[in-house]
Amino acid sequence: HHLLFHGNTIHGAERRRETDGTPTRGRPEPLTYYYFGGPISEVTAAARAAVAGKLDNVAVVGLGAGSLACHRQEGETWTFFEIDPEVVRLARDPAMFRFLSSCAPAAPIVLGDARLTLAASPQQFDLIVLDAFSSDAIPTHLLTREALRGYLAHLSSHGMLLVHISNRHL
């Protein structure tokens, strides 16, 4: 397995070998909180239903290992907003994690503070996933009224905002 840690929190895990020791093949499967069939699958299904089956544009604030990319379907554009260039380097390196290279190889990654970079985007999104953490804490500047107004201003008419709030303090 390859694991991405920040502080004391796992932010992504990928199985790299089968139980018999052979390398895994095909599309990687997220193993942590974004596992297939979990709550994120329910949210993306509801968001797709709200827009007649396909999400044109999805914004993900926080890249981590890139495991959310494997919830993307053909024809959907998922844009990742990430503040840490080292996280981008790790997620893009298929020797470390294959989520991006296998599931969304052309996905745009916007480097910088998502409050500012998302606000500067001309796009409307059918789904915005706020999944930014510093170790196990949510950066509070991403949860201010001003920041939330900015996210809501970039939602399409049927868009949804998903805020991942699980942490050791809530």
Where are these regions (language model features)?
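Class I S-adenosylmethionine
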Residues: 1-108, 114-118, 137-139, 170
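Local beta-strand N-terminus motif with an aromatic residue
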Residues: 55, 124-126, 158
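Receiver (REC) domain switch-region micro-motif
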Residues: 58, 128, 161
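Short conserved AdoMet
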Residues: 73, 122, 155-156
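A short acidic, Gly/Pro-enriched loop at the edge of an enzyme's catalytic core
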Residues: 119-129
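Conserved NAD(P)H cofactor-binding loop of Rossmann-fold oxidoreductase domains
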Residues: 132-133
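A short glycine-rich, Lys/Arg-flanked "PGG" loop and its adjoining helix->strand segment in the class I
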Residues: 143-158
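Conserved beta-strand signature within the Rossmann-like core of class I S-adenosyl-L-methionine
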Residues: 158-165
